[in-house]
Amino acid sequence: MSATLALTEQLIARASVTPDDQHCQQIMTERLAALGFECETIASHGVTNLWAVKRGTDGRDGKLLAFAGHTDVVPTGPLEQWTSPPFVPAHRDGKLYGRGAADMKTSLAAFVVASEEFVAAHPDHRGAIAFLITSDEEGPATDGTVKVVELLQERGERLDYCIVGEPTSTAELGDVVKNGRRGSMSGELVIKGVQGHIAYPHLAKNPIHLLAPALAELAAEQWDAGNEYFPPTTWQVSNLHAGTGATNVIPGHADLLFNFRFSTASTVEGLQARVHAILDKHGLEYTLKWSVSGLPFLTPRGELSGALEHAIRTETGITTELSTTGGTSDGRFIARICPQVIEFGPPNGSIHKIDEHIEVRFVDPLKNVYRRALEQLIA
């Protein structure tokens, strides 16, 4: 069994459901400390975070490549639906099964073993290697990576490159990497009406009827055309509720929850202003609360994307696709302190599902791609 596969199994065996790290980071810390990493645990409200760094011969002047990821996993769902226990690594038909196999304990193991091999081959490496690991990525993400980033900002720490080990591949390892992500902004809209008897609508104001024309306009609006890297911004309703449950009462208010997934072609302020303008045009009486969970970020083609594309092509023969599709990730926080952030990891077809797994044939090539990136960027 390869070192990467063995470490992956060791991590899967830890039932590290958010925010419980279950000592996964301790396992990683022991391996990294043996390589000369300075390891720091940063705890916050039950969340465990790890910042580990090994400087090269250039000291603080050298380029720094960080590996970022999470030890936490999503809940298993009904245990009886799993073919084998989710926290007991199991091999079947060339696949390794277990919660976190794809998202993202294989990436964590590959990070560690790639670093071990790199340091052994390049003991006098010039640049620095760092690890930024959290147990709060699958949950609220309020005490994890964002807290470490804030601390690093206070210290004036500079990151030059960051590889986030999210499972970005689809059919084959390396066919897709993420060089950016869309922003996410949600709104809680309350339309005010006047409750009344449904037989006397002239004595009431139906907030559903009042909302309907504005809702149709919002749904049909083209917010932007996207750009070279991003698809057009989308606006979607996630929840709509009104009424008491009775069939003879006009509701007094209607509650609407919606979400924007937006590109760098739009801004928070611009999107908010356009929503308010549409609501105001229709003469609605309303309250609207906004929350922004992440801003869009983009890493244009450059040193990091080039290194990963070359490493993937050399290792797998695949020409990778740069993509910004999908949901948010911790990359949105890291982009605050790092100009080049790219996500790359194993295929994502089974993530968050019953019987999550990774094909064993991808495990060591993933490690090799990470090692090749180290060699190209900081050796």
From Swiss-Prot:
It catalyses: N-succinyl-(2S,6S)-2,6-diaminopimelate + H2O = (2S,6S)-2,6-diaminopimelate + succinate. The keyword Metal-binding applies. Pathway: Amino-acid biosynthesis; L-lysine biosynthesis via DAP pathway; LL-2,6-diaminopimelate from (S)-tetrahydrodipicolinate (succinylase route): step 3/3. GO terms for biological process: diaminopimelate biosynthetic process; L-arginine biosynthetic process; lysine biosynthetic process via diaminopimelate. PROSITE patterns: ARGE_DAPE_CPG2_1. It holds the Pfam family Peptidase_M20. The active site is at D72, E137 (proton acceptor). Binds 2 Zn(2+) or Co(2+) ions per subunit. Its EC number is 3.5.1.18. Zn(2+) 2 binds at D103, E138, H352. Keywords: Amino-acid biosynthesis, Cobalt, Diaminopimelate biosynthesis, Hydrolase, Lysine biosynthesis, Metal-binding, Zinc. Gene3D superfamilies: Zn peptidases. GO terms for molecular function: acetylornithine deacetylase activity; cobalt ion binding; succinyl-diaminopimelate desuccinylase activity; zinc ion binding. It comes from the Bacteria. InterPro entries: ArgE/DapE_CS, Bact_exopeptidase_dim_dom, DapE_proteobac, Peptidase_M20, Peptidase_M20_dimer, Peptidase_M20A. Its cofactor is Zn(2+); Co(2+). Homodimer. This is Succinyl-diaminopimelate desuccinylase. It comes from Burkholderia cenocepacia (strain HI2424).
